[in-house]
Amino acid sequence: MELATTGKVNEVLFMNRGEGESSYAQNSSFTQQVASMATPALENAVETLFSKDFHLQALNAVDLGCAAGPNTFAVISTIKRMMEKKCRELNCQTLELQVYLNDLFGNDFNTLFKGLSSEVIGNKCEEVPCYVMGVPGSFHGRLFPRNSLHLVHSSYSVHWLTQAPKGLTNREGLALNKGKIYISKTSPPIVREAYLTQFHEDFTMFLNARSQEVVPNGCMVLILRSRQSSDPSDMQSCFTWELLAKAIAELVSQGLIDEDKLDAFNIPCYFPSLEEVKDIVERDGSFTIDHMEGFGLDSLQMEENDKWVRGEKFTKVVRAFTEPIISNQFGHEIMDKLYDKFTHIVVSDFEAKLPKTTSIILVLSKIDG
């Protein structure tokens, strides 16, 4: 089934649930490293809020696209720690922290809240009591009342789209991106244009919703998967989808997957360049860019020399965030075969020595007035 509508994507876009071997909770170490790179930016954002004369009694913060791993707990701890530091410096007496944890309805909120502990949120007798609430729903629309948020955080979520790009079939209904699930070297220009158009539309909706919810001078800290090259089909930015498409194609050749299902499937995700993100923010005009930087990390952070161990580790990471949406299209019964094939391709094509993964840290302030 094509992911042609927002409603359909919202139903199947979530990380692997639970705490098992293939779960996101057990395979989120890479995104944890990505988020840790943005910790100084998050700390600075909290400091900045205290310098803007909000006369805060409670700081309202949200983690958009929080998933169910430990990463969101680190975000809460960082915000709380910085607030306690500022309270001691400013001799605040009554400051409280309200944190909202947001993701789509399919997110494993049970595992998420099961992982909350007193080590994360502390107790209500501390100098900064912390209250946590779940908020299911799409962050591409409004989630909160006007002027109610002081701080917005989102890591590795905003590059996901509300739907597969429109216009990827011709007048006869034939697929224009045959054999691929994302932009590739063989994709016609219209595929690249459709993906950028969809990202522009979705990121603009995201900014518009936040512009209504964030207080004037409030802050947003966003971390997105991105690319360095101006070419969206550059292997550094699309290697995961290229390898996954290759694994699916091999199962098609074995008669295990219908070729039409592969041709009809386009992953609802886009890895933008710094220039594309900057252009959209400036066109929207609701926020100023306080800080923006790109950085690269090894796709596998491990000392293991065995290429098969590295390949299997990478497969677990990819499976944790792709299996729900991939299995919806191609069937749950072939997932083990598919990801086993993926491992073999990773090892044979790269010997598990993968390109660096590029990300963007973006710090925005809501324009006053």
From Swiss-Prot:
Cofactor note: Binds 1 Mg(2+) ion per subunit.
Catalytic function, reaction form: theobromine + S-adenosyl-L-methionine = caffeine + S-adenosyl-L-homocysteine + H(+); 7-methylxanthine + S-adenosyl-L-methionine = theobromine + S-adenosyl-L-homocysteine + H(+)
Site (Involved in substrate discrimination): H153, R225, C269, V317, H332
Leading EC class: transferase
InterPro entries linked to this entry: MeTrfase_7, MeTrfase_capping, SAM-dependent_MTases_sf
Binding residue positions for Mg(2+): N177, D263, F265, N266
UniProt entry keywords in alphabetical sequence: Magnesium, Metal-binding, Methyltransferase, Transferase
Keyword Ribosomal protein included in the entry's annotation: no
Effect of C269S: Strongly reduced caffeine synthase and theobromine synthase activities
Function: Involved in the biosynthesis of caffeine. Catalyzes the conversion of 7-methylxanthine (7mX) to theobromine and of theobromine to caffeine.
Protein name: Caffeine synthase 1
Species for this entry: Camellia taliensis
